[in-house]
Every structure is written in structure tokens, then in C-alpha cells.
């Protein structure tokens, strides 16, 4: 998903329409569910919805760690900047845990949604 979002970002940049990372995540989640008329069942974390999701480490690689340290040092540690980093630099190494239908199917037994330590 991250690579697809990154490629979409590049194409939109070339066309003069920069897509914010939050918009890209929306399009991959609730936006897609709405387009398929499935938003009453999937695409969000509302109670009663089917829940397939991942837990991510924003700083899984050395380049990502440097980027996160840079953002923190300049007080730019926002969800938009974290997601932009995943959108442009993310890959499978950022996936800590995977949940399908609310049940953990991948990752350590202690996947407790902690932020990556730096």
C-alpha cells in the first residue's frame, strides 16, 4: 500500500496536484469503501465494523529514523508528516502487526501499539 501511495504522490506532483498524505490514506481506506458502497461495513474503526488493519513502525529503517529525528528536532512531529514518510519511504519493514477481522494474524504477541522508540 505504501509504495502505491508513493507512486500516486509522484504522479500527482508531476501533474501539479500534490496530494496530502492524509488524503492518500483516506482514499486507501474509507474513500475506497465508499466508492464500493461498503462504507457501512469497512473503512473505519467505528464499533461494529469489520476491522482489517496494520500497526506500523514509522522508523523501521535507518533513513526513516533519521527523518523522524529531524522532524522531532524541529517540532514537526505530526500525523501528516509521519504518514508522508510512510507514503514516500514505507515498505513491508514498517509493518509490526497485522489484524484481520480484529484478530492478530502477524506480529509479536506483545503488539501493544507503542510508538517506535528512537
Residue ranges and their predicted role:
Residues 108-118:
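Intein/HINT protein-splicing elements and their conserved insertion hotspots or analogous self-processing inserts
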Residues 51-109:
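C-terminal cap of metal-dependent C-N hydrolases
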Residues 1-71:
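His/Asp/Glu-enriched, well-ordered alpha-helical/loop segment
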Amino acid at each position: 500500500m505504501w509504495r502505491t501511495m508513493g507512486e500516486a504522490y509522484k504522479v500527482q506532483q508531476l501533474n501539479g496536484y500534490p496530494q496530502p498524505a492524509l488524503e492518500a490514506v483516506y482514499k486507501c481506506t474509507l474513500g475506497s469503501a465508499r466508492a464500493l458502497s461498503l462504507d457501512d461495513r469497512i473503512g473505519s474503526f467505528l464499533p461494529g465494523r469489520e476491522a482489517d488493519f496494520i500497526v506500523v513502525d514509522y522508523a523501521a529503517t535507518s533513513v526513516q529514523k533519521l527523518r523522524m529525528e529531524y522532524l522531532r528536532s524541529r517540532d514537526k512531529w505530526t500525523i501528516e508528516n509521519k504518514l508522508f514518510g510512510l507514503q514516500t519511504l514505507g515498505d513491508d519493514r514498517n509493518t509490526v502487526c497485522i489484524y484481520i477481522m480484529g484478530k492478530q494474524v502477524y506480529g509479536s504477541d506483545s503488539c501493544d501499539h507503542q510508538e517506535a522508540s528512537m
